């Protein structure tokens, strides 16, 4: 029986290896990218559902969603650090046909994420008021932010854990299973929002409860998918290795994701604080613009996440030609998809903002910001895939630099300086300018790495 199971496992590993290293690159990336794009869009739809339903209450409540978005960004930062770090290392080990090491990375990454979620959730609940203030709450927004944020912090371990399970499935080329878990959670949240908020008369608290419950259910489904042998690598206590070496390895590979998501959280805080002098309507408007921009960005992000396991697997298998070919294909397809969504949003900017909050002041605050963002998002497919390329190939430092560009090095100085000279227009255009500059800054790194891949291929042929 043991021998029979071993033969089945060997066939599974061989089949997975052939799929990731021999399937035509365009077909492979699209097959992995479509479920991930669907997952990302649904995740963003249910985030936007909170914005939509809470927007039915009042402008201050709508602003609270933008404040608590910073909490979710913090949790996702640590969740994706563990998930991307474990997933990238795991996928490269599978490319080398080292299943035991892959299982250690997967199991340890999940354990780290759960522990971090517990710590962040505990401290957040203990210091709830100061935390919400730090994120940019005004006196009128604070009561709503407390209610919504409390629920998110209670569900924190499940949110961070889901990030890892999602990445384990994706990096093994099983994106369809990850899509199921995220989709069910998203649909439940969209159904739960109006029930808890209006049928049970819980308002913002109801939106928080709905989001927390949907996150817990998503975690359960993703864990079930991993535990029912949908993956080659194993996730169990036996493979948890909380040694300094293992945790540092996962953390350093995943560090670019921590930077990307963490700086997104910091950027949201600073953006809210710079918008605060212009009132709750300004905070609500920038929150809506942020959600709409993320919806468009998620199309490219989903496709890029479809490319990640391809890059990691083939880099481990020394198929550098496929790593390079995949990056170029994903960049162009991502730009086209983002362009389509941006064009629609550009044309219907006012009606779309009004859909979330029918307040003329909110619409006017958000109009210019959204339109300029639609144009600048066209540059982000390149930046996004450059960061994912380096992270998947284990190039820690360069991947971290890529992540620093958009939300850190470029954005933070701009959001502090521009409003001093341009007023609220400076708040509106800071992110679009940062997007363009980050794209320009990324180009030399990618060209240099492509040259290194070409050189490695020449040496292998010799």
Segments predicted by a language model, with ranges:
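Small-residue-rich hydrophobic transmembrane alpha-helices
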Residues: 62-122, 159-178, 285-349, 380-402
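Helix-terminus/linker motif at the lipid-water interface of multi-pass membrane proteins
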Residues: 41, 45-63, 132-139, 195-204, ...
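Short alpha-helical transmembrane segments in multi-pass integral membrane proteins
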Residues: 1-33, 90-157, 199-255, 311-376, ...
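Short runs within selected transmembrane alpha-helices of multi-pass transporters and secretion channels
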Residues: 83, 152-170, 178-189, 207-220, ...
């Amino acid at each position: 029986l043991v021998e029979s199971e071993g033969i089945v496992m060997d066939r599974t590993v061989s089949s997975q290896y052939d799929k990731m290293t021999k399937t035509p690159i365009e077909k492979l990336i699209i097959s992995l990218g479509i479920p991930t794009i669907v997952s990302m869009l649904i995740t963003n739809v249910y985030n936007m559902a909170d914005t939509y339903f809470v927007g039915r209450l009042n402008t201050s409540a709508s602003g609270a969603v933008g404040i608590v978005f910073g909490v979710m960004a913090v949790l996702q930062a640590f969740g994706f650090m563990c998930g991307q770090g474990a997933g990238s290392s795991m996928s490269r080990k599978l490319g080398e046909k080292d299943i035991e090491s892959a299982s250690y990375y997967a199991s340890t990454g999940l354990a780290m994420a759960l522990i971090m979620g517990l710590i962040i959730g505990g401290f957040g609940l203990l210091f709830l008021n100061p935390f919400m203030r730090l994120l940019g709450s005004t006196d009128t927004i604070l009561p709503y932010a407390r209610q919504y944020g409390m629920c998110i912090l209670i569900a924190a371990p499940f949110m961070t854990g889901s990030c890892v399970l999602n990445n384990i499935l994706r990096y093994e080329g099983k994106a369809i299973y990850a899509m199921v878990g995220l989709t069910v959670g998203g649909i439940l949240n969209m159904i739960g929002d109006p029930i808890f908020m209006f049928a049970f008369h819980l308002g913002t608290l109801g939106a928080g409860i709905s989001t927390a419950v949907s996150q817990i259910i998503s975690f359960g489904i993703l864990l079930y998918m991993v535990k029912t042998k949908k993956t080659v690598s194993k996730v169990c206590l036996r493979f948890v290795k909380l040694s300094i070496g293992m945790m540092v390895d996962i953390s350093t590979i995943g560090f670019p994701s921590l930077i990307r998501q963490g700086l997104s959280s910091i950027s949201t805080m600073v953006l809210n604080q710079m918008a605060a002098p212009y009132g709750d309507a300004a905070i609500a408007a920038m929150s809506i613009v942020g959600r709409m921009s993320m919806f468009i960005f998620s199309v490219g992000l989903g496709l890029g996440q479809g490319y990640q396991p391809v890059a990691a697997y083939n880099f481990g298998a020394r198929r550098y030609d496929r790593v390079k070919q995949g990056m170029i294909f994903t960049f162009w397809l991502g730009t086209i998809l983002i362009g389509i969504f941006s064009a629609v949003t550009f044309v219907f900017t006012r009606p779309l903002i009004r859909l979330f909050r029918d307040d003329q002041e909110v619409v006017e605050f958000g109009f210019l910001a959204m339109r300029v963002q639609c144009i600048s998002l066209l540059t982000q497919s390149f930046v996004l895939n450059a960061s994912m390329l380096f992270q998947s190939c284990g190039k820690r430092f360069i991947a971290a630099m890529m992540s620093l560009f958009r939300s850190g090095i470029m954005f933070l100085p701009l959001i502090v300086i521009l409003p001093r000279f341009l007023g609220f227009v400076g708040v509106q255009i800071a992110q679009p300018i940062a997007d363009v500059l980050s794209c320009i800054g990324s180009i030399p790194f990618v060209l240099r790495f492509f040259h290194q891949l070409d050189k490695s291929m020449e040496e292998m042929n010799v």
